Amino acid sequence: MATASSSDDAGAAMSISIANSSKRPIATTKTAASIPPYATLAFGALSGFASCVLLQPFDLLKTRLQQLDHRPLSPVSNKSISKPQYASRTQKLVAITKDIVHTHGYQGLWRGTAPTVIRNVPGVALYFYSVSHLRSVASQRQIPLISVAIPSDASSNTSTLAKLSTTGNLLTGAVARVTVGFILSPVTVVKARFESSNFSAATERTLLSSMREIRAQSGFRGFFQGFTATALRDAPYAGLYLALYEACKTNLAGLSRSMDGGLGTGNWMVVSASGLLAGTLATLLTHPFDIIKTRMQTTPADTLHQIALAHDPKSTLSPSVLRDSLKPSVWGMTKHLWASSGPRALLDGLGLRCARKAASSAIGWSIFERGRSWYTEREASSSAQEAGTGTRLLDHKQV
């Protein structure tokens, strides 16, 4: 992507795979040998699984933080309700953690891991595959404002992702993330209910029982509850993240030129640091929509109905007609949050989400890019060995 770095750095990121090694016969061409889809999906799934298992407690605690109101007021009136008060978010976080450990033991911090894995492993795999494919297509077709010229040579220590402009990174990241998010929305809703304390563990024992409960309460639409807020969070997040990730890689690689030999954009330290920085910055900019998404997915149906009556224009309709289907809009939920908890409600769980996203980005992209680099290096070595064997056989026949 376009940055203030040198032209040598701009030529560091090659199209979807590394196939320009000087050991290979096709090194003089500009067409990179593509990594097969199964390899991209496998490395994406592996990175997603590692992030899920290691970082699930962050997700659980974030959900519990975001589902609480700051003041003991009902959603639509000034009547007090019995909710604990905390002087700070730190006290709230400590109290929630102690309650979970006391009630369920330390394993309780990993509640919701199953739906998280079911969502994230295929989700991350599909996202990495989709964004890689979109970037490869855009790079090869040289689309104006999206693609950039691909150099005929590149270091073996460069990224395996195709090179696009800032606009291209924004668009491909957003399209891939929102598409995958829509496909996996039902599992996302189940995951939120597993992590929330607003739903009975008896009805949320398994994925199937939770899905039956959602279907009974809200119908098929219940599986996409909060998707608008999710899309408003994910589209800018993914676009900003991918653009920032590529910018950080290029700039960090440029800064490393003062070192002996420098570091390429595919170096694991550059990739990990870029993922961490990009994940943190993109999270800061999109966090309010994560709050709204969580509230939409973890608030009981009757409370959502009351919020909709109080803050949405549909409240003028007969409550008896809308009792089973009325849900607040994104704007209606935003007004409720502002009225019941003030602007600070839009910051709940920000620290946990930043820590989780930063760590997830560093882990995910490191495993993904390292896996792809390992695959291309293995293929290059195999091709070199085959070429050497063929040459020896030809020499033997000539003798």
Curated annotation (Swiss-Prot):
The chain crosses the membrane at residues 41-66, 112-138, 170-195, 226-249, 270-296, 349-367. Residues 379-399 are annotated as: Disordered. PROSITE patterns: SOLCAR. GO terms for cellular component: mitochondrial inner membrane; mitochondrion. It is a multi-pass membrane protein. It is found in: Mitochondrion inner membrane. It comes from the Eukaryota. InterPro entries: Hem25/SLC25A38, Mit_carrier, Mitochondrial_sb/sol_carrier, Mt_carrier_dom_sf. Its main location: mitochondrion. GO terms for molecular function: glycine transmembrane transporter activity. Solcar repeats lie at residues 35-137, 164-251, 266-374. Keywords: Membrane, Mitochondrion, Mitochondrion inner membrane, Repeat, Transmembrane, Transmembrane helix, Transport. One of its GO terms (biological process) is glycine import into mitochondrion. Pfam families: Mito_carr. It catalyses: glycine(in) = glycine(out). PANTHER family: MITOCHONDRIAL GLYCINE TRANSPORTER. Mitochondrial glycine transporter that imports glycine into the mitochondrial matrix. Plays an important role in providing glycine for the first enzymatic step in heme biosynthesis, the condensation of glycine with succinyl-CoA to produce 5-aminolevulinate (ALA) in the mitochondrial matrix. HAMAP family: SLC25A38. Belongs to the mitochondrial carrier (TC 2.A.29) family. SLC25A38 subfamily. This is Mitochondrial glycine transporter. It comes from Mycosarcoma maydis.
